[in-house]
Amino acid sequence: AEPNVTVTGAAGQIGYALLFRI
């Protein structure tokens, strides 16, 4: 059972951007 790379990647990129935006 592999998680959706697209969904995980998108969420990861958004979270990463938000983290570095603070």
From Swiss-Prot:
Catalytic activity: (S)-malate + NAD(+) = oxaloacetate + NADH + H(+)
UniProt similarity note: Belongs to the LDH/MDH superfamily. MDH type 2 family.
Gene that this sequence comes from: mdh
Organism listed in the record: Actinoplanes missouriensis
One GO MF term attached to the UniProt entry: L-malate dehydrogenase (NAD+) activity
The keyword NAD belongs to this UniProt entry's keyword annotation: yes
Positions bound to NAD(+): G9, A10, A11, G12, Q13, I14, G15
The EC number(s) this enzyme carries: 1.1.1.37
InterPro entries: NAD(P)-bd_dom_sf
GO biological process entries: tricarboxylic acid cycle
Protein name in the entry: Malate dehydrogenase
Protein role: Catalyzes the reversible oxidation of malate to oxaloacetate.
Keyword list, A-Z: NAD, Oxidoreductase, Tricarboxylic acid cycle
